């Protein structure tokens, strides 16, 4: 009951801090660092060089990160956090989803990220 709610709130805050760290690294072009901080399952699903290419392309198209607003969050089993943001980049504003997980004894890590460039979860707005 109450203990779970407290735990959920705590892990949600940690995940939100991780997203902010990710955006900061993105703006600095430190894509490898984002990759290194991700979960093993993320690394198993995505080769490092592919991730670096995708992030470089994202920077070219979307531009630098400007701001974000949390639209929705969900905590599953007090260890998995889904965060949906409306994210403003220089060129576009769109919805992005981040999934963080805390495995036993491990720090929280990025399990998945999804950029909704097709506008399934919210309008893609061209800013420039």
Question: What do the PLM-derived regions correspond to, one by one?
Answer:
Residues 1-28:
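Short, low-complexity N-terminal intrinsically disordered segments enriched in polar/charged residues
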Residues 26, 57-60, 105:
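Structural motif
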Residues 8, 20, 36, 40, ...:
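Acidic-enriched, low-complexity/disordered segments with a strong bias for Aspartate over Glutamate
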